[in-house]
């Protein structure tokens, strides 16, 4: 699952 984890981190960083 490459990209999914990165997307999750991006969402948390935006918060």
Swiss-Prot record:
Its main location: secreted. It is found in: Secreted. GO terms for biological process: proteolysis. Inactivated by p-APMSF, leupeptin, iodoacetamide, protein kinase C inhibitor, phosphatase inhibitor, ATP and PGE1. Is insensitive to acetylsalicylic acid, ADP scavenger system, protein kinase A inhibitor and hirudin. GO terms for molecular function: serine-type peptidase activity; toxin activity. It is an enzyme of class 3 (hydrolase). The keyword Cell inner membrane does not apply. Residues 1-15 form the Peptidase S1 domain. One of its GO terms (cellular component) is extracellular region. Its EC number is 3.4.21.-. Expressed by the venom gland. Disulfide bonds: none annotated. The keyword Secreted applies. Dimer (it is unsure whether homo- or heterodimer). This is Snake venom serine protease IVa. The lineage of its organism: Eukaryota, Metazoa, Chordata, Craniata, Vertebrata.
